[in-house]
Amino acid sequence: MPHLAELVAQAKAAIEEAQDVAALDSVRVEYLGKKGHLTLQMSTLRDLPAEERPAAGAVINQAKQEVQQALNARKEQMESALLNERLAAEKIDVSLPGRRIENGGLHPVTRTIERIETFFGELGFSVESGPEIEDDYHNFDALNIPAHHPARADHDTFWFDAKRLLRTQTSGVQIRTMQNKQPPIRIIAPGRVYRNDYDQTHTPMFHQVEGLIVDKDISFTNLKGTLHDFLKNFFEEDMEIRFRPSYFPFTEPSAEVDVMGKNGKWLEVLGCGMVHPNVLRNVGIDPEVYSGFAFGMGMERLTMLRYGVTDLRSFFENDLRFLKQFK
């Protein structure tokens, strides 16, 4: 079958000339499809004597297999070339500097709150919370702050109406806790508070943590020891500390706590005192049986002292150049 050999040669030549998979598939259809040149050779078998047909059929099948193998080889070659091209295009230049991943960090005030919660948690204090929109009873009356007290003035407090306000302290959390729990009580109450003030050391919203212990035989000595240990832990040094007599309506006696700054001047850091008997009576606790101490501190102020920040407003301006210093 000399004509068969020519067809195989033509098919192989067409396969080599094919430049892509689509052209290669066209060659396959032309020679091996249902009406392909090699497939049609099978129809010539009927013109041969019966005894020659098997041998002739075998020759045609061998020719078809030879062309199919050439197709497979050429297709594999094309796919390999395409893969190499893609890999070359996707190759990573290891000499290029890597892209630095910017890790986030906690806000410095959040760091301070977590540090305080950790310290007092190790002393057995639980963390309590309460509403930021408060009523005048929990924010003032129950804390022994009478109606004529300056803290109730419009210029200091954000009032919604005659009874509702944005809390000026987290002390209301202490009142609610004492109303719902029986002594012994040992809590801290971190949260946002609001006062109508704005300057280098004050903002209308700031963070405060207040602490409370109510139990039998609680003394001012317990208060001093607790706060001394806290300040030593927070500032990570054995700082000189003084308790200065002060006045708060909800504690008696009351004191403000100062620490000695690096400039040799005293710096106020918090207020504290023994829970006033009237406050205990307001929540149904007998002051003849139980006593307690309370303290309160501004988170931004402590953070300023710890990190040497001079303007409290920097904590709320969201300047990444400032915040990245505290990662």
Swiss-Prot record:
It comes from Proteus mirabilis (strain HI4320). GO terms for biological process: phenylalanyl-tRNA aminoacylation. The gene is pheS. It catalyses: tRNA(Phe) + L-phenylalanine + ATP = L-phenylalanyl-tRNA(Phe) + AMP + diphosphate + H(+). Its cofactor is Mg(2+). Tetramer of two alpha and two beta subunits. Coiled coil: none annotated. It is found in: Cytoplasm. This is Phenylalanine--tRNA ligase alpha subunit. Pfam families: Phe_tRNA-synt_N (PF02912), tRNA-synt_2d (PF01409).
